[in-house]
């Protein structure tokens, strides 16, 4: 399954030729023209919750996709602004968004971003990836998104909140066990 973000309505059709899921970035999650263009491709539309939105506000974004004729919607929790330089995950939002009838994914690594640091570069807390992922599965997230890299320190983007690739298999094994325990 291939997923990619689109940032403008005129990108939807071209991207749809190559991907299975069109993703709407968090900062664009209220852009009607973008949501409608993505919906009209017929592809699954994954809408990332803006850091500035409540989970309940995501119903309006999902409705725009549905009203455009596409019932293939996913929602992604990716943290909420907490002060000026931090994000937090409010796990209540996962079941709240699931109540709309769509799968909800937890974007673990972006939830651990620390934007607007004094150095001008976004920071992160990768040491909390396992904790946040486990909690997300425990509250019933339908999926987990984790950015990985062999060497996050040299990644071209988001390295400050990535999981080292060699740690992924062990983490996924733990998450599967948690999922099995709660079912």
PLM ranges: what are they?
Residues 151-183:
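C-terminal helical cap(s) of enzyme catalytic domains, especially alpha/beta-barrels
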Residues 1-2:
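Short, small-residue-biased leader/transition segments that mark boundaries at the very start
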Residues 15, 61, 132, 168-171:
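Hydrophobic side chains in well-ordered alpha-helices
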Residues 25-26, 87, 110, 154, ...:
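Flexible, active-site-adjacent loop/turn segments at secondary-structure boundaries
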Residues 6-32, 38-39, 52:
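Glycine-rich anion-binding loops of enzyme active sites
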Residues 14-15, 57, 116, 155-156:
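Short Asp/Glu-rich motifs
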Residues 6-15, 64-65, 141-144, 148-152, ...:
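Electropositive, surface-exposed helix/loop patches at the edges of structured domains
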């Amino acid at each position: 399954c291939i997923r990619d973000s689109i940032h403008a309505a005129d990108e939807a059709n071209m991207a749809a030729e190559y991907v299975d899921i069109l993703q709407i970035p968090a900062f664009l999650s209220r852009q009607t023209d973008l949501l409608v263009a993505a919906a009209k491709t017929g592809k699954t539309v994954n809408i990332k919750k803006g850091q500035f939105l409540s989970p309940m506000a995501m119903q309006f974004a999902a409705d725009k996709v549905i009203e455009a004729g596409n019932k293939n919607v996913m929602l992604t929790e990716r943290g909420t602004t907490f002060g000026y330089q931090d994000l937090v995950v409010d796990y209540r939002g996962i079941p709240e968004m699931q109540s709309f009838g769509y799968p909800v994914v937890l974007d673990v690594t972006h939830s651990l971003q620390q934007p607007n640091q004094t150095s001008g570069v976004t920071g992160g807390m990768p040491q909390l990836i396992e904790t946040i992922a486990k909690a997300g599965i425990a509250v019933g997230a339908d999926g987990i998104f984790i950015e990985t890299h062999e060497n996050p320190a040299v990644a071209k983007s988001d390295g400050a909140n990535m999981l080292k690739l060699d740690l992924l298999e062990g983490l996924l094994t733990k998450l599967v066990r948690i999922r099995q325990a709660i079912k």
